[in-house]
Amino acid sequence: VERTLFSKEEREMRKLAPLFLVVLALALVQCAPPSTPAPEPTSPPVEEPEDTPVPEPTATEEPAPTEEPAEQVLRIAFDASDLSSLDPHFAAATQDRAIVDMVFNGLIRYKPGDISQFEPDLAKAIPDPTTEDDKQVWTFELREGVMCHPWNGNEGYELTAEDVIYSLEKAANADRSAYAGEYTGMTFEAPDDYTVRVILDQPLSPALFLPKVTDYAGGFVVCKQAAEDLGDEAFKTHPVGTGPFMFESYTPMEMVRLAANEQYFRGAPKLTTVEAHYIPDISSRELGLREGELDLAEGLREQPWIEKMTGAEGVTVDVFGPGETVVLHMNQSVDPLGDVNVRRAIAYTLAREDFLAFFGEDTADALYSPVPVEFLAGGLTMEEVGEAGVIYETDRAMAQELLAEAGAEELELTANTSERASYRRTYEAIQDQLKQVGITLNLEVVDHSTMHSLIREDANPLVVYIAWRPNADVFLTRFYHSDSIVVTGAKPDTNFSHYTQIDDLIEGARVETDPDRQAELWKEAQLKIMEDAAAYPLFILKFVFGRAEYVDFGYDLMSTLALYPQITENTQLTR
């Protein structure tokens, strides 16, 4: 069923409403009795000033009504049925991270539109680390006068170091954050209201440390009083931060409405309201863009859709990076995937070129290692993977031999896939390819947030995961360190393969101060992953959004970690 914001009849009524009001106003003026002027006194008393009668205005004398400034309401639609969590320390899906990005800040931030540059955010400046008692210390001086949003009748209040410490400790708590593993070996101090110290047991390079305190994942700062007052569960649907937009309302399976934060420390936003709509049907999102009922909409990350919408009147298609890695993780705790021959058989069955052909040249690039070499230090090139003998060029005869050796010739698996096209179509392509060697993959389509919950409950033997992380350490720690194994890990995260063989390499690289040696350790870890066929890197998928031409982001969009074209205080509608 198509979902649009307004029906045709509603749109016609909206067009006629202003004319109806004008006619009604004129009718009331003509029907009103004439005013009776008070008699003018000969000598007006001081205590009673002259009451000058006001004549009834004629049609030619009636002043033109004063127009109030038009509200700037931006309507964005996501490929999702509903939100999952707006607690920034749990937000993972596109529709959640987008809202979180508008509501919260970090100590520092990625420059909007360009992830290659850091900027101060809640902090006044980006510090250099110092050493105290053989420990690395990062000291942040906070901006003064930054206000937390009001909530549930409570007034906003000034954010201080107490809020930042509370937020970092929450991010480091596995019971209250999906990103706790990022903060192992850190302690946090507040010497005064505007100073925050982060103390590390093991030193980290700026490239590894700074992303942990940015406007990303666990680095988002929540307001302590609001979080404690609402409680963790309510906070998931009523976020309170310091960002340019503040939470106003949530209608399940329909919309989140945000209002401009007039007290935002960078200045009041140019938009008055942002409406984030949940519309999983691509036809409805397209129609909304074409008919002007949506201003921004998540598109299909596929070449035909880009070409179709590029030709739509008044619509611009934004394709931007860095994109996300698309990787197939194979759960070794599930028989027969515990047998490396079965995992290698699956790898030999898959054909990267088929995925690239399906998604298209504008959106997809081949991926040969868990860490993408095009963007991050420590990634592996196609040549390096090939020389190591772990590229797994498509060889379905070899795949069938390996399955026979493992006694898994008639293997049948069931996996849950998101309704989102990027997930569903990737799973369907894998399903078709596995069928060529006798493997049956049954797919259950669920809404996006449910899929995220199920795979974290270890429900899938095969997990397609689409993600970006800021550096090789985060990629390897969160997907392949034993602490990150879903459900059973010390700090469960996204190790869907239950892989345990590279902890020492990950930890050694993390504290290595020589960048070249650090990259070598990361590469060694990935070659081991590939040798053991714990995961199979498929491709990199860029972001695609359709935008009305009158939407001005207020910055040049090249890349973002927020998974959508960021809406900032400078975003506006120019129509």
Q: What does each of the following model-derived ranges do?
A:
Residues 233, 261-307, 431, 440:
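Ligand-site clamp/hinge motif
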Residues 125-176, 197, 288, 336-338:
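Aromatic- and charge-enriched surface segment that lines or borders ligand/interaction sites
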Residues 141, 176-226:
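Surface-exposed binding/hinge segments that line
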Residues 77-131, 169, 240-242:
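N-terminal lobe/hinge region of extracytoplasmic solute-binding protein
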Residues 75, 160-166, 193-199, 243-244, ...:
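Alpha-helical secondary-structure segments
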Residues 111-113, 204, 212-269, 273, ...:
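Gly/Pro-rich hinge or "lid" segments in bacterial periplasmic/extracellular proteins
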Residues 26-68, 574-575:
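Ser/Thr-rich, Proline-interspersed low-complexity disordered segments
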Residues 251, 349-380, 419-432, 453-575:
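Detector for C-terminal structural segments
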